Amino acid sequence: MNELRPKLFDVMKGYSKAQLIKDIIAGIIVAIIALPLSIALAIASGVGPEQGLYTAIIAGFFISFFGGSRVQIGGPTAAFVVIIYGIVAEYGTDGLIVATILAGIILVIMGICRFGSLIKYIPYTITTGFTCGIAVTLFVGQLKDFFGLQMKSVPSEFLDKIIAYGKHIGTINVTATVIGLVAVAIMLIWPKVTDKIPGSLVAIIVTTAIVYFAKLDVNTIGSVYGQLDSSFPKFHVPAISMKLVQQMLSPAFTIAVLAAIESLLSAVVSDGMIGDTHKSNAELIGQGLGNIFSGLFGGIPATGAIARTAANVRNGGRTPIAGITHCVTLTIILLVLMPLAALIPMTTLAAVLLVVAANMADWESFFRLCKSAPKSDIIVLVATFFLTVFFDLVVAIEIGVVLAALLFMKRMAETADIKAWKYTDSPDITPGEAEKLRDIPHSISVFEICGPMFFAAADQILNINSHHHTKAVVIRMRSVPAIDASAMKSLHELSNRAKRKNITLIFSHVNEQPMHVMEKDGFIELVGKENFHENIVDALDYAEELVR
């Protein structure tokens, strides 16, 4: 059970006052970084700005308290924007809350069932494809506010967005665009000045001051969303129906997989920064609890945020106390300073997310894979990317995983091979080769199987043939790591064929997994235990005795 025990309980032994001070300072700095991102991501997701802070506070607390990483910072991330926007557009806020809670439950189950290590089986091509797809979708989704387009709403579909922008291109607000460009410029230049204060916060303060004091005609959070709620989030159980639960299962599963991938990736990155090892299953449970309570308190899906976690480490955070401090700081900001957030220009928040989208897309890896990866990997990469952009993340991940699995099985089936040994007097054997070969009678045929024998390659077993003078067939299996039920079916068919011809099947060097499957299947008893040998020499000696 130690692997499910929250990391907080482990690191508090010998906790010093000096580290407490460092954790508090790191938590406050991370809260300042998280503030503009949480608000911007909530708005981009189609919900109110307060819900972004609710998520960072509630989910962030549970992720830090119950998670398996010392330094993980949880909250809303750009990866969820696309899927949240689609859920809200189709099913409303109740649908989003149900999906968030279901995703949390799935994550908790994944953690309890020790699925933490299974996330590594999600192919790199899929994560690269959907990450770049999310970046493109997120980038395009900000153009309305960045240019100040006079549109009542933005369609959820990618192509519909482009068409809608084209129809309203004449409504561009030049002032809003200039303010947005100023915000982008500040975020690009500020890191060269100092990395202690995030450029996004500086951009928000500067552009908000310009718009407010110059009384510019630019949409702000207050003009779009009205007065902001500065009270602590209230516990709320949504109206749940079985139909809504069924509708939300698929997006909830996608949210859970995304949260697991991003949080564990963040945990691995932070491990390298602090020289620690996270508990992946405890982390999944912490992520699950964070999402369950985020939904119940009106928040949106959350996960570990790589950038905020890295900032926590760089500023001295070394225990979950830093993450909890980040939540407390955001709570104080929510209760005291939230009315000031109404003054923030919408174009500035759009600019923040444009920069986030540009930074999250790993185009270098994307194009490198397109140039150098095997054709099957390129197919998965490109398919996942375009499905994310033109359909949605749910479809992209589901089809991407299935496609990757099918192409992987095809590749494995192509590597599986069965070769017949040659006789020393074969016409195509050179004298040098003949010296290396064992001289065996023509009444014995030897076949060597290479590669895993599973359903995609099982039919190759039936390629093992015999001549009219064959009395024994030796099958060497030292290069077969695994077999499945389909391969066993083919072996049974081969055995029946051999019996009809009075041919003895002899097996050599059967590895542990194939031997276990054969034993469980009853195949060893059927063929005869005496026909299984540890090595090819013993198998050939036995075969020669039989055919004398």
Kindly label every feature range from the protein language model:
Residues I73, F507, F532:
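Conserved SAM-binding loop
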Residues M1-S426, S490:
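Transmembrane helical cores of multi-pass ion-transport proteins
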Residues L526-Y542:
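Short acidic-hydrophobic, aromatic-tinged amphipathic segments that line or gate anion-handling sites
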Residues V328, P514-M515, E534:
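Short secondary-structure capping/turn micro-motifs that flank functional sites
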